[in-house]
Amino acid sequence: MTGRICILVMDSFGIGASLDAARYGDAGANTLVHIYEACKRGECDIEGARKGPLMLPNLAGKGLYHAAMASSGLPFIDLATLAIPSGYYGYAVEQSLGKDTPSGHWEMAGVPVTFEWGYFPDKPYCFPEELISEFIKQCNLPGVLGEKHASGTIIMDELGEEHIRTGKPIVYTSADSVFQIAAHEEAFGLQRLYDICKIARNLVDKYQIGRVIARPFTGKPGSFKRTGNRKDYATPPPEKTLLDFLKEDGREVIAIGKIADIYAHQGVTQEIKADGNMALFDATLSAMKTAPQGSLVFTNFVDFDSSYGHRRDIAGYAHALEQFDARLPELEVLLQPNDMVFIAADHGCDPTFPGSDHTREHIPVLVFGPQVNSKFIGRRDCFADIGQSIAEHLQLSSPLTHGVSFL
């Protein structure tokens, strides 16, 4: 075994529209560049938090802006003013058909999603009548609220009071392959919410739905707030992923945040939950202090997507990026001689775009560590190149089927 791997997934941090973006209604999307330009125009100031241009010195030093320029061709920054990147840098193109969390993560771990997910139409009462009636029956519910495409925070404010009064959970979806259930932790019960999500998971399988998501909230009308007790019930990957092969090989696979949920808890040896990007970074640092040789520490930083991308909060996204960037030196000092850190994303979610959905984009691929020299790895034709490179570095005995190593 040689060294350890740490993967940091900046959920939704795309760096330029993919060639097929127009098929998804996402032509021109660019999460990073549009945030960068909004900051440059002075549109992302937050009193007491951030002001002026986007400042990401650590990510820039690892090649983020070089990768973004290669991805989109947009001259948003003068590369001549930047130092030569200190690690591997490039961008990757998604082969999976979706632009969702499971597709991006599974492909990254060696399993592109080549089948079509099921989706619910964007219309009132969007769920099949058979599905809802069976859900109500099996869960012994008085009914449901919502039944439409919606932003989770908006529908929570819209229907939260009625939910508490009637005991009916709020069910909704989006452009992703999801069946989401929101309920008040005290009035409805957190465990009860989890229980009905498990029932829903079985019911939506026939519709090829990727995830059932529990969306608990607390508070009173006018001040409802989501809690950190979200739980994703994902359909399992169709093939063994990098995580499965590592676990079978006797390695430690430490899943932080929602990683275990994304892989349906397969291939994971340890699960660590944390709420919020900074708590997730703290958990990552703690794991890296004790992770043995040959192990994988895998963290998803969900706030970029759920708190800022979907909510089209450009300033909040910029601030979150700067907070993340500032923590990277804390991770670097914990690295052992043969360790590698991979920074990537799973899709885009351009906060300057209309609507509230993900955007079809390239993702950054940045790799650094004590023994990693500067190298432009160019365009990677599949997210699975990340998994294949990790498999090579960790000397995994079972090679992945997809992807080409760039090490």
From Swiss-Prot:
Its EC number is 5.4.2.7. Its cofactor is Mn(2+). CDD domains: PPM (cd16009). GO terms for biological process: 2-deoxyribose 1-phosphate catabolic process; 5-phosphoribose 1-diphosphate biosynthetic process; metabolic compound salvage; nucleotide metabolic process. It comes from the Bacteria. Its main location: cytoplasm. The keyword rRNA-binding does not apply. GO terms for molecular function: magnesium ion binding; manganese ion binding; phosphopentomutase activity. Disulfide bonds: none annotated. Pathway: Carbohydrate degradation; 2-deoxy-D-ribose 1-phosphate degradation; D-glyceraldehyde 3-phosphate and acetaldehyde from 2-deoxy-alpha-D-ribose 1-phosphate: step 1/2. The keyword Isomerase applies. Keywords: Cytoplasm, Isomerase, Manganese, Metal-binding. It is found in: Cytoplasm. It catalyses: 2-deoxy-alpha-D-ribose 1-phosphate = 2-deoxy-D-ribose 5-phosphate; alpha-D-ribose 1-phosphate = D-ribose 5-phosphate. Mn(2+) 1 binds at residues 11, 346-347. Binds 2 manganese ions. Gene3D superfamilies: Alkaline Phosphatase, subunit A, Phosphopentomutase. Isomerase that catalyzes the conversion of deoxy-ribose 1-phosphate (dRib-1-P) and ribose 1-phosphate (Rib-1-P) to deoxy-ribose 5-phosphate (dRib-5-P) and ribose 5-phosphate (Rib-5-P), respectively. Belongs to the phosphopentomutase family. This is Phosphopentomutase.
